[in-house]
């Protein structure tokens, strides 16, 4: 029997390895940008076409490569970053494995043009699917120009699973922003199909954040900083009032590298506990700088998951530095007063006249204890209690109470507990003020049904009602629009702007009027009348949710917009409704076709069956 185990050719092995490193066009962008930074570039330009399917080109002014290095760079595990295993624990570069270029060349058509400062001529190299084509000496600018064309051209299955151009370009922008945020000293620019999307000049860190995400964040950023033997922490955190339900900007960086770290995220959220509304997320940009030997980057192909030697200590430091920053910036109300800010008010000196003491006449013969004004002396209530007639007093009280009871008709249990069925057909659509309900802890309504007791979350119930009203108005084309007194400027990063373009028709159809002002800015001119005061927040939440969920159809967008409008218009949690409001809300809720769940699938009503209640008293 012949042997069945064989060694794979390098081309196939590279394609398999590319599956871990190169997952989509954004993966190529990440690797090429990091290579440019490792080469010492101070100016980096990124060009993409068809969201990276046709072309990804990175141009930099870095060190460049010799012809032999250019050829060797596309071999598997060829790197200039390490020479021994111990070098892994002293890395300051972004790349080190020598897998990226080989993986890219295995699934795309690659062209490299490079030149070093000491060389008069440069090198042009072409590779198609791991096969080296032309290697020539040509004129070339300083640095590197690396073009990746027709990604996954030889792996149709991988190309088929790519998402839409809008989705893939958003992923590219995400990787681009991560690299730009951690390298503010480098100039970046990105072009899509020849059109400039974003141009970032070298700048301080705060300005780089504002250039990427918009100037509206300026008032939200609080600087933080701490130096310790374990790690240095710097960056910015958001004010509590800037916390969002969706689309919060949350970034961790360590030694110039973006990372994900759920444990450190918990530390940030713990620092904001009780000072931001439940369900919201703060913005933060945290930068860690520590010895490379204290972290392990080599645990994931994308190098975004990093282990720390002392994570618990860093967890505590994160909480300390954020709380100090929030406290010192007056973002959190403090109990102590700042005496440095007190106004020095001089003591009142008067008009300058001497105050004359008024004359007082005394009657030396007056004795206030001589006469009491009572006909009889005061007796001790403890010793003389029978004389006060308490028994007679209680007898009179009980007789009066019994007389009032006899005058009132007896209350029957059928009248005390309403028998409302929990079905739309059993309840009139007209709100009734006769429905009995009890407000529990300012959030839940307790009412009676024929099946038992119903516990209703009135915030969610109101949200359901408002959603149904809006959808009914939309179906009748009866949405009332109102112009804003002053148009509101909405600034987005490029990824948000592309989502607005995709959703603008849907927003226009339901009463919003958005006028484009540039690549990533819009003017909000009008909105549905019921949410005119929070229209900008609704638009932002709709866009962020679209980015996260990828909703694109008319029905999905309409449901999303209606849900967000209902969320902002609903009675807030903690605000107790009046008895009439609660009764009307229950009547309208039970008349709805779907009164059990909110539009986003959260439970509204929980029923305690009559049998369960009886069982508790057996």
UniProtKB/Swiss-Prot annotation:
Molecular functions per Gene Ontology: ATP binding; ATP hydrolysis activity; ATP-dependent DNA damage sensor activity; mismatched DNA binding
Pfam families: DNA_mis_repair, HATPase_c_3, MutL_C
Single biological process term from Gene Ontology: mismatch repair
Record has DNA damage as a keyword: yes
InterPro entries: DNA_mismatch_repair_CS, DNA_mismatch_repair_MutL, DNA_mismatch_S5_2-like, HATPase_C_sf, MutL/Mlh/PMS, MutL/Mlh/Pms-like, MutL_C, MutL_C_dimsub
RNA-binding keyword on record: no
Keywords in alphabetical order: DNA damage, DNA repair
A GO cellular-component term linked to this record: mismatch repair complex
UniProt superkingdom: Bacteria
UniProt function note: This protein is involved in the repair of mismatches in DNA. It is required for dam-dependent methyl-directed DNA mismatch repair. May act as a 'molecular matchmaker', a protein that promotes the formation of a stable complex between two or more DNA-binding proteins in an ATP-dependent manner without itself being part of a final effector complex.
Family: Belongs to the DNA mismatch repair MutL/HexB family.
Annotated protein name in UniProt: DNA mismatch repair protein MutL
Lineage of source species: Bacteria, Pseudomonadati, Bacteroidota, Bacteroidia, Bacteroidales
Gene from which this protein is expressed: mutL
């Amino acid at each position: 029997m012949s042997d069945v185990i064989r060694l794979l050719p390098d081309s196939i092995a590279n394609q398999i390895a590319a599956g871990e490193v190169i997952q989509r066009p954004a993966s190529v962008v990440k690797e090429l940008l990091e290579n440019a930074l490792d080469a010492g570039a101070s100016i980096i330009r990124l060009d993409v076409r068809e969201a990276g399917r046709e072309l990804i080109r990175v141009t930099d002014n870095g060190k460049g490569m010799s012809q032999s290095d250019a050829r060797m760079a596309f071999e598997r595990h060829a790197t200039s970053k390490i020479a021994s295993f111990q070098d892994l624990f002293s890395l300051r570069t972004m790349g080190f494995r020598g897998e990226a270029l080989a993986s890219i060349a295995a699934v795309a058509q690659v062209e490299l043009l490079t030149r070093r400062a000491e060389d008069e001529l440069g090198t042009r190299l072409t590779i198609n699917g791991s096969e080296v084509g032309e290697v020539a000496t040509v004129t070339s600018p300083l640095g590197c120009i690396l073009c990746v064309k027709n990604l996954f051209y030889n792996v149709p299955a991988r190309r088929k699973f790519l998402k839409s151009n809008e989705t893939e370009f958003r992923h590219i922008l995400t990787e681009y922003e991560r690299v730009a945020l951690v390298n503010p000293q480098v100039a970046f620019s990105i072009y899509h199909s020849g059109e400039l999307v974003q141009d970032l000049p070298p700048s301080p860190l705060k300005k780089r954040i504002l250039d990427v995400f918009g100037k509206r964040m300026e008032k939200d950023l609080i600087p933080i900083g701490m130096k310790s033997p374990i790690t240095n922490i710097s960056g910015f955190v958001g004010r509590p009032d800037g916390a969002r339900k969706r689309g919060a900007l949350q970034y961790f960086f360590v030694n110039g590298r973006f990372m994900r770290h759920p444990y450190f995220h918990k530390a940030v959220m713990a620092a904001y506990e009780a000072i931001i509304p439940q369900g919201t997320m703060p913005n933060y940009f945290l930068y860690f700088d520590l010895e490379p030997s204290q972290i392990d980057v080599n645990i994931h192909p994308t190098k975004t998951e990093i282990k720390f030697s002392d994570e618990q200590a860093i967890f505590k430091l994160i909480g300390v530095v954020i709380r100090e920053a929030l406290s010192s910036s007056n973002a959190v109300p403090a109990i102590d007063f700042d005496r440095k800010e007190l106004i020095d008010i001089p003591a009142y000196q008067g008009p300058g006249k001497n105050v004359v003491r008024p004359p007082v006449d005394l009657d030396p013969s007056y004795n206030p204890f001589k006469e009491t004004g009572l006909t009889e002396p005061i007796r001790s209530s403890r010793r003389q209690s029978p004389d006060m007639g308490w028994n007679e007093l209680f007898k009179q009280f009980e007789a009066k109470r019994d007389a009032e009871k006899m005058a009132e008709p007896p209350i029957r249990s059928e009248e005390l507990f309403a028998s409302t069925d929990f079905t739309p057909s059993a309840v009139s659509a007209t709100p009734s003020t006769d429905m009995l309900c009890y407000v529990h802890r300012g959030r839940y309504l307790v009412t009676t049904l024929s099946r038992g007791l119903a516990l209703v979350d009135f915030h969610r119930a109101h949200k359901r009602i408002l959603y149904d009203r809006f959808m009914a108005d939309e179906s009748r084309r009866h949405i009332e629009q109102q112009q804003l007194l002053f148009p509101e400027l909405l600034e987005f990063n490029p990824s948000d702007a592309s989502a607005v373009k995709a959703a603008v028709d849907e927003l226009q159809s339901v009463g919003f009027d958005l006028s484009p002002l540039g690549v990533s800015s819009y003017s909000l001119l009008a909105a549905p009348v019921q949410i005119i005061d929070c229209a900008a927040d609704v638009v932002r939440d709709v866009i962020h949710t679209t980015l996260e969920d990828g909703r694109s159809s008319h029905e999905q967008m309409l449901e999303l917009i209606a849900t967000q409008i209902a969320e902002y218009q609903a009675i807030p949690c903690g605000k107790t409704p009046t008895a009439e409001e609660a009764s009307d809300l229950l009547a309208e809720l039970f008349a709805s076709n779907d009164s059990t769940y909110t539009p986003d699938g959260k439970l509204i009503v929980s029923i305690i069956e009559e049998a369960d209640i009886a069982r508790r008293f057996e």
